């Protein structure tokens, strides 16, 4: 039973990472033209990094969950 609960938690965090990734992309999209592509990408990476750091303590008990979350957060939906 504990294993399925851990799997469910990992899946939820992976989905959360994907949702946050898309949200950050859409939030910064209006500034893409004024910032330029390089600064837009740097800002996205910085925001994603801040989210990872903020949630790292919460996820630190499960390295698999943390890995899935970081992979989902850094995935490019393009």
Swiss-Prot record:
Residues 1-27 form the signal peptide. Keywords: Signal. This is Uncharacterized protein 018L. It comes from Frog virus 3 (isolate Goorha).
């Amino acid at each position: 039973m504990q294993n399925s609960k851990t799997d469910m938690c990992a899946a939820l965090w992976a989905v959360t990472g994907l949702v946050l990734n898309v949200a950050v992309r859409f939030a910064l999209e209006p500034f893409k033209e004024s910032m330029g592509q390089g600064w837009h990408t740097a800002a996205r990476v910085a925001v994603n990094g801040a989210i990872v750091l903020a949630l790292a303590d919460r996820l630190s008990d499960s390295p698999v969950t943390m890995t899935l979350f970081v992979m989902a957060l850094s995935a490019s939906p393009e």
